[in-house]
Structures are given as structure tokens and as C-alpha cells.
Amino acid sequence: MPSNVLFRIYRWKYFWLCLIVIITLAMHLSIITNPSELILDEQHYVKDARYILENEQTQRPEHPPLAKLFIVSGITAFGDNPWGWRIPSILMGTIEIALFYFICRRLNMSNRAANIATFLFGFENFNFLLASVAMLDVFFVTLMLAFFLLYLSREYVLSGIFIGLAALAKLYAALGTPPLLIHWVFSRTRPSRWFILTVILAPVSFIVLMPLFDFAITHEFQNPIMRIKEMLTLSSSLTFDNTTHPAISRPWEWILNYIPMAFWYTPHYTGAISPSVWGFIIPVVLYMIYKAVKGNDAGLFGFAWFFGTFLLWIPISIATDRVSFVFYFYPTIGALCIGLGLGLNQAMEWASSQTRKAKIPVMAGIVVFFLFHIASFIVLTPVFIRS
């Protein structure tokens, strides 16, 4: 009887998703207090959360309010300590993995392909790192993924609200809208024209909800148009011309050169794309274009996602000269994991129909890739190497 129960659990379609979520959550919690000091931009956002709690004002007006409120809520619930600073990010990062899996399934990827993509996503270094620290990025990326999933589920009202919420966590989330416009235009199974509700509600929800979230911080209502102007002015003030930070880099450098960025040294929090993902960026993007041309919805969506959250950064960087860092690539990781999941699953399907002589080298190569991905994770994250 117990063996039958275990077999049914193993055969459950959400088994691998749950296992990935449980393992990554456990790893997050195992390092939540290490270090006990503020990591990188936690210096800005945790200190700002303290200032909000003490003074009902923000020291970081260049950013919208929602992600700040998540960090404030963590400190309020768990205290001004590493648990309070980082638990909201960890919980959002855990939700993010589940959302990603269901996005894959909504794109008609097989359960195996979705599991492969989710495995790569869950154990990708940047994805894990930015869910481990009290920075703004994991909040807007998770809300952006909710936006993607709601759009794919044809929940157009909610999708419009959620991209507004994502932008209220960090303005960069606005780059999540072009992928859906591209997908809507080019998809062979074009979604309903009610998608216009998403387009309308995205800016409306941003403008309407921002004064409410700002009020939660300052207890005063502020003009949302003036706040938008303030955020755009302040966020564009740091340029490559007037900034000397050693880690700044242009978007095209992120894929042409391997650029690790130290978040913390002991234990080492290394800001870098997992080599197992970085090394395949260009082939995977070309593969997704090929799949999109062949009518594959996941290939189209994956490329559109890559275009919106990364390729658009290149003209933006040239036009504005605004400083950027390699961790700005983080919102694009999911697109590449979709492409890798599609490709690896297709290779496995092809190998299964071949002779043993042809099958063995293909399957061996896939196993080596998975081991390389895990090895990259072990080397880059502070979970296993803490000295």
C-alpha cells in the first residue's frame, strides 16, 4: 500500500513543481540570516523601509511605492532583522516559480517540457539570488508573471490590473506589455479582442492605485501625474556619463561578455546569469524564432518576452544613457527557460524514437547539461559554499 501511494504521488502532474518549490524555499530559509548585514541595494530599500515606518515619508521617491510596502510589511510582521527584510522576497520568489510553470502549461507545453523549463528557472542563479534579498526586482517580476498568466487565461481585466501593480513595484515592469502585444498580433490562435481591456486598464490601474499606495506611506494623497514626472526625472538622472560605479554595464554586454557582479563576498552572493543559460542565449532565441515561425505558441511567446524585457533595453540605453547593471537581465530569464525547455524536450522526444546507438549520446548530452546547470547553481549561490 505505501509503495502504491508513493507511486501515485510521483505520477501526480504537479509532483516536480511541488518538489522544486519545496527545495528552493528550504534553501532560501537556510540562508535568510546569512549575512545579517544589508546586501547591495538592501542598503537603499531596507533603510527606506525603516524611514517610512519612523517618518511616514520615503527617501527613494524615484521608485513607485508597492515593493517598498512589501518590505515594510515584512519588517512590521517579523521585526527589523534579516527575516523581516527578506521573507517577502522569498515568498514572492516561491510564488514566481509556480506562476512560471502554469505559464508554460498555458502555452501548451507538455508537462515534461514545463517541468524541464521550471527546473531550469527555479535553479537559475539570478532567479534564486534576487528572491533572496530585499530588493525591488522580485516583486515586479512576480507580478509581471501573474500578468502574463492572466492574459494567457483570457482574464483581461485582471491582467490589466496586475501589470499596473507590477509597474507600481518598479517602473521597469512596463516592458512586460510589449511581449503581449507581439503575441496578440502574431499568434495563430489570436486571443479575444477583449484584450483591449488589458491595454486600457494597465495605465488606469497604475494611475488610480498609485495615490492609494503612496497614501499608505505618507498618509497624504499625491497627484499621480506629478509623481510620474518625479519618478521619471529622478530615475533618468543617473547616466553612464555621470556615474562611476564599477559594475555598470550596457545591455548588449550582458549576452556578449560574462559579467558577474558581486552582491556580497562572504558568503558569496554572485550576481550572474547561470552559465548553463547564458551560454545558450543566442541559440535559444534563434530556436524560439524558428518555433514561432512554425506556429508554436510557446516559441512565439518566449521570443516576444525576450524582445520586450531585453532587446528593447538596447535602444532605451542608447537613447537615455541611463545606467544599467547585469541584474536587469533577471526579468528575461523565464523567456530563455521556456526556449530551453522546448528544445530539451524536443531532443528527448527525438532520441526516444531512435536506435540505441543514436539515443545514448543525445540523452547523455542532456544529462550533462542538467548537471552543468546544477553545478552552476552550486558554485554561484551561497547555499552550499558559505565561507
Could you describe each region identified by the protein language model?
Residues 12-39, 201-221, 370-380:
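Transmembrane signal-anchor helices characteristic of membrane glycosylation enzymes that use polyprenol
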Residues 24-27, 117-122, 149, 163, ...:
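Short helix- or helix-capping micro-motifs
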